[in-house]
């Protein structure tokens, strides 16, 4: 048996691979365990052994010819009976009469398949128009060789992915590229040259005669080729090993390149956005993740083996990984928070800023006009107007079902549940929530990196930072007052690290590098912001900001990943106290997302005294914001200097200096947030009224229909 017989043919691309290969060298397909007879029968006395009908793996071949179908003993003066064979209409392969499918391409046998006419003993198998050729050692081998050469010669290569397609294919079966208009059907000379240098014909010791190497068409198919002289078995093995070593690596690289090109050609825009998002998680590019989310991409999508191959970074990407897995693996807490933020899609959100676009644009212009830069050594931006947003008290006059619909469309139910039920962070005091009417509601906003800026404007003006006016002021203030904020930030970070037992010192270059990163976040629309930016926003608002947030980052499995460090009080410490307002705003923080916490208007104070003399009129709404957590521990004051840090009593004294504080009858230290509808901005009041009119109309419809029914009953 020759070395050629050891090769196995790929069932996908018909490439003949070396026996040691477990995958196809061309298309990387797995080796099939139940091979179809694709090689010509070999001239050997062992062919009479019936055991050859079974492969080494024990699987039975599809066709096992015996002595009754075709005599396996070759007689010099006797030719096989080929008249009973039928030719496949797809690949022209000559199959045995008992086969119901083609051995090569598995095509169904047609009724009345064309059979070859019997040959006279003096004729040799050849087509018309070709000169006679010497009789081969085995006529069946001759026909099988011709069929393979015909099949290869008639294929046309795809100009996009180089895959060789069948001649009847009008488009490439791999990349769907159209067939070139001038594709040659039978490249005669190429097939002859390829057959002469084909690696599948290495050393044929048993073929001593000259045989035909023609293609599938007529013409000059009778060109002769003389085989190389026979060599010993050891030399043949050495030659095969050298060929597989030298050519195999090049073939594998070429096959990998072709496979990669095929995968790229099949990919769509959504696939590229997903791969960019995966790379963005690894490299820390949040914009790529946001681009994938905004396009409607599935966050739970998993990487496939082909996509991992395109990314070409096995140390970072594995098949089956999602964006959440990558964010956990590379500790991207900000991205993890964005990815895990679940926004309910069951109800369409309907907030005042979306219902009244004309009024909203006017309010945005008012916001831009209210921002000014102070002259002097500290050129920070600041607001000239004190505006506080509250939900109207008329909501309580609506029917319960309309109220439920309103809250579903204006509140973030997931944030409200996490801050109230999963962790007692807000509304934990029955005294504040019920008797003092200081229940806080989490407004819904965008889930992108602008959620901090959106929540600040929602808590004051009731709108989004759509035009990035507040972000621009934040960026300019950070750069213009960089020295002031940098000193506070550096001193605070050093103290905070030491408070957790982390005694280390950084070089000034490292501090500057971290500070440059904080500055860059402020200038990038959509980038998530940090504690320093909340501190700067307190100066722009000229009022304190109280953040009620979760204490720990948690994975989607509920595992604690680290401290959030956002909860606490942010005071405008770099301004003079006389230049600032004492009425704070409240924000909620959950898993990398900020939400505005607002109260509902109340009808005056009545007997709601909280241990303080409230000499105000009935039009003013006072919301009592707790300055302690549910465990009655004082909230931290962020970015204090070394001189300002002291005991808890000293920090409480500082809170009383910057805010109007009092202690309730239950002993809770609270800060008073004051707002007045009469003193509020008229555009904000008009926007809220127009938004509320839509729910009033919903409440009026059932009443109207009930009244009509009553009138009809009276008429009867």
UniProtKB/Swiss-Prot annotation:
A zinc finger (RanBP2-type) spans 3-33, 82-111, 152-181. This is Ubiquitin thioesterase zranb1-B. It comes from Danio rerio (Zebrafish). Ubiquitin thioesterase, which specifically hydrolyzes 'Lys-29'-linked and 'Lys-33'-linked diubiquitin. Also cleaves 'Lys-63'-linked chains, but with 40-fold less efficiency compared to 'Lys-29'-linked ones. Positive regulator of the Wnt signaling pathway that deubiquitinates apc protein, a negative regulator of Wnt-mediated transcription. Acts as a regulator of autophagy by mediating deubiquitination of pik3c3/vps34, thereby promoting autophagosome maturation. Plays a role in the regulation of cell morphology and cytoskeletal organization. The active site is at 451 (nucleophile), 593 (proton acceptor). Zn(2+) 3 binds at residues 158, 161, 172, 175. Residues 118-136, 183-203 have a biased composition (Polar residues). It catalyses: Thiol-dependent hydrolysis of ester, thioester, amide, peptide and isopeptide bonds formed by the C-terminal Gly of ubiquitin (a 76-residue protein attached to proteins as an intracellular targeting signal). ANK repeats lie at residues 268-298, 321-348.
């Amino acid at each position: 048996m020759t070395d050629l017989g050891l090769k196995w043919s790929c069932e996908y691309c018909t490439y003949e691979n070396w026996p040691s290969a477990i995958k196809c060298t061309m298309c990387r397909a797995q080796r099939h365990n139940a091979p179809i007879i694709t090689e010509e029968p070999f001239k050997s006395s062992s062919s009479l052994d019936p055991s050859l009908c079974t492969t080494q793996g024990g699987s039975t071949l599809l066709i096992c010819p015996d002595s009754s179908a075709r005599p396996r003993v070759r007689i010099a003066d006797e030719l096989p009976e080929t008249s009973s064979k039928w030719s496949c209409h797809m690949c022209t392969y000559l199959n045995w009469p008992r086969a119901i499918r083609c051995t090569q391409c598995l095509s169904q046998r047609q009724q009345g398949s064309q059979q070859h006419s019997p040959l006279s003993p003096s004729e040799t198998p050849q087509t018309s128009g070709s000169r006679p050729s010497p009789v081969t050692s085995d006529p069946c081998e001759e026909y099988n060789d011709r069929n393979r050469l015909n099949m290869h010669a008639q294929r046309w290569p795809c100009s996009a992915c180089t895959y060789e397609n069948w001649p009847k294919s009008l488009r490439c079966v791999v990349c769907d590229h159209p067939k070139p208009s001038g594709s040659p059907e039978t490249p005669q000379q190429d097939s002859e040259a390829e057959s002469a240098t084909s690696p599948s014909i290495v050393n044929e010791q048993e073929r001593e005669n000259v045989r035909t190497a023609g293609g599938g068409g007529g013409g000059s198919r009778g060109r002769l080729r003389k085989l190389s002289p026979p060599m010993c078995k050891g030399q043949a093995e050495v030659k095969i090993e050298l060929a597989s070593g030298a050519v195999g690596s090049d073939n594998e690289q070429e096959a990998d390149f072709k496979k990669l090109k095929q995968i790229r050609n099949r990919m769509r825009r959504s696939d590229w956005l997903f791969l960019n998002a995966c790379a963005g998680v690894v490299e820390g590019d949040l914009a790529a993740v946001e681009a994938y989310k905004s396009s409607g991409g599935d966050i739970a999508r998993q990487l496939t083996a082909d996509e991992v191959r395109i990314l070409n970074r096995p140390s970072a990407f594995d098949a089956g990984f999602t964006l959440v897995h990558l964010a956990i693996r590379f500790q991207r807490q900000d991205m993890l928070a964005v990815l895990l933020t679940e926004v309910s899609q069951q109800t369409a959100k309907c907030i005042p800023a979306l219902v009244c676009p004309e009024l909203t644009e006017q309010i945005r212009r008012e916001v831009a006009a209210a921002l000014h830069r102070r002259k002097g050594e500290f050129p920070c931006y600041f607001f000239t107007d004190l505006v506080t947003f509250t939900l109207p008290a008329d909501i309580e006059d609506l029917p319960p079902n309309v109220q439920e619909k309103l809250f579903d469309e204006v509140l973030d139910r997931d944030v409200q549940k996490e801050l109230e039920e999963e962790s007692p962070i807000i509304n934990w005091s029955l005294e504040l929530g019920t008797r003092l009417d200081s229940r806080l509601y989490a407004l819904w906003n965008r889930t992108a990196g602008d959620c901090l800026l959106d929540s600040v404007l929602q808590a004051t003006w009731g709108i989004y930072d759509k035009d990035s006016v507040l972000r621009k002021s934040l960026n300019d203030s950070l750069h213009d007052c960089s020295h002031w904020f940098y000193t506070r930030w550096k001193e605070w970070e050093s103290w905070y690290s030491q408070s957790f037992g982390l005694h280390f010192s950084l070089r000034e270059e490292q501090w500057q590098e971290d500070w440059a990163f904080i500055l860059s976040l402020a200038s990038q629309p959509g980038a998530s912001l940090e504690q320093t930016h909340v501190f700067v926003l307190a100066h722009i608002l000229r009022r304190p900001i109280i953040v009620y947030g979760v204490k720990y980052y948690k994975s989607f499995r509920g595992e604690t990943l680290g401290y959030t460090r956002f909860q606490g009080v942010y005071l405008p410490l770099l301004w003079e106290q006389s230049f600032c307002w004492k009425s704070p705003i409240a924000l909620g923080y959950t898993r990398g997302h900020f939400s505005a916490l607002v109260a509902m208007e109340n009808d005056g104070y009545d007997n709601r005294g909280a241990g303080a003399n409230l000499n105000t009129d009935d039009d003013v709404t006072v919301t009592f914001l707790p300055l302690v957590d549910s465990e009655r521990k004082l909230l931290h004051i962020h970015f204090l200097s070394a001189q300002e840090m002291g005991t808890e009593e000293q920090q409480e004294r500082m809170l009383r200096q910057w805010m109007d504080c009092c202690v309730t009858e239950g002993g809770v230290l609270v800060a008073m947030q004051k707002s007045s509808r009469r003193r509020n901005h008229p555009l904000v009041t008009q926007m809220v009224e127009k938004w509320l009119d839509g729910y009033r109309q919903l409440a009026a419809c059932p009443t109207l229909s009930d009244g009509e029914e009553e009138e009809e009953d009276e008429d009867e």
